[in-house]
């Protein structure tokens, strides 16, 4: 089964697709969707959404996962991140996929073994676990980490998401 991990950001949104067969996890693809900061906020959100729609069409994942938002010190940045996150989450939701959410510490613990792991530790573990990963940016590594986390926790998370959504695919 193919799982999509998403690491939303207004400038760069990371994405990663893994294949899960039994207890084996393999790399399918990873990359980023960039928005043009010269455009309006609405146009940038449309770019992010369209980019994730293209990923969904190209790789056909059956489930998606995203990292929960943390609150920045700058309220305007937090708001923009939330808007980007909404645009990114909307794509798989409209495609009928359940979208699971994980706290950053849970993602790090699932991949590195500790919830306080640094970004470079996450990237190093992703390269170890998924040797074919291209990891254009740390955002792509984070997205693959989110997908791996979902692979580990999906049974519980899927049940919770289905209960919240009242259904799913």
UniProtKB/Swiss-Prot annotation:
EC category name: hydrolase
Catalytic reaction equation(s): Endonucleolytic cleavage at a junction such as a reciprocal single-stranded crossover between two homologous DNA duplexes (Holliday junction)
Binding site for Mg(2+) 2: 67
GO biological process: DNA recombination; DNA repair
Keywords associated with the record: Cytoplasm, DNA damage, DNA recombination, DNA repair, DNA-binding, Endonuclease, Hydrolase, Magnesium, Metal-binding, Nuclease
Quaternary structure, from the entry: Homodimer which binds Holliday junction (HJ) DNA. The HJ becomes 2-fold symmetrical on binding to RuvC with unstacked arms; it has a different conformation from HJ DNA in complex with RuvA. In the full resolvosome a probable DNA-RuvA(4)-RuvB(12)-RuvC(2) complex forms which resolves the HJ.
Source species of the chain: Rhodospirillum rubrum (strain ATCC 11170 / ATH 1.1.1 / DSM 467 / LMG 4362 / NCIMB 8255 / S1)
Record localization: Cytoplasm
Cited function: The RuvA-RuvB-RuvC complex processes Holliday junction (HJ) DNA during genetic recombination and DNA repair. Endonuclease that resolves HJ intermediates. Cleaves cruciform DNA by making single-stranded nicks across the HJ at symmetrical positions within the homologous arms, yielding a 5'-phosphate and a 3'-hydroxyl group; requires a central core of homology in the junction. The consensus cleavage sequence is 5'-(A/T)TT(C/G)-3'. Cleavage occurs on the 3'-side of the TT dinucleotide at the point of strand exchange.
One GO term describing the cellular component: Holliday junction resolvase complex
PROSITE patterns assigned: RUVC
Biological classification of the source: Bacteria, Pseudomonadati, Pseudomonadota, Alphaproteobacteria, Rhodospirillales
Domain of life of the organism encoding this protein: Bacteria
Protein name per the record: Crossover junction endodeoxyribonuclease RuvC
EC number: 3.1.21.10
Family the entry assigns: Belongs to the RuvC family.
Cofactor(s) demanded: Mg(2+)
This protein's record includes keyword NAD: no
């Amino acid at each position: 089964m193919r799982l999509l991990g998403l690491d939303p950001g207004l400038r760069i949104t990371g994405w990663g697709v893994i294949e899960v067969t039994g207890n084996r996890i393999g790399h399918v693809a990873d990359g980023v969707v960039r928005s043009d900061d010269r455009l309006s906020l609405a146009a940038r959100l449309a770019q992010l959404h369209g980019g994730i729609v293209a990923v969904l069409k190209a790789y056909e994942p059956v489930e998606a996962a995203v990292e929960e938002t943390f609150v920045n010190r700058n309220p305007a940045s937090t708001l923009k991140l939330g808007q980007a996150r909404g645009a990114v989450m909307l794509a798989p939701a409209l495609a009928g996929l359940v979208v699971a959410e994980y706290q950053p510490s849970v993602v790090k613990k699932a991949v590195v073994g500790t919830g306080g792991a640094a970004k470079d530790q996450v990237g190093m573990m992703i390269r170890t676990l998924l040797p074919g990963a291209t990891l254009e940016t740390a955002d792509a590594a984070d997205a693959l980490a989110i997908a791996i986390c979902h692979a580990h926790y999906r049974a519980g998370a899927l049940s919770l998401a289905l209960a919240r959504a009242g259904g799913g695919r």
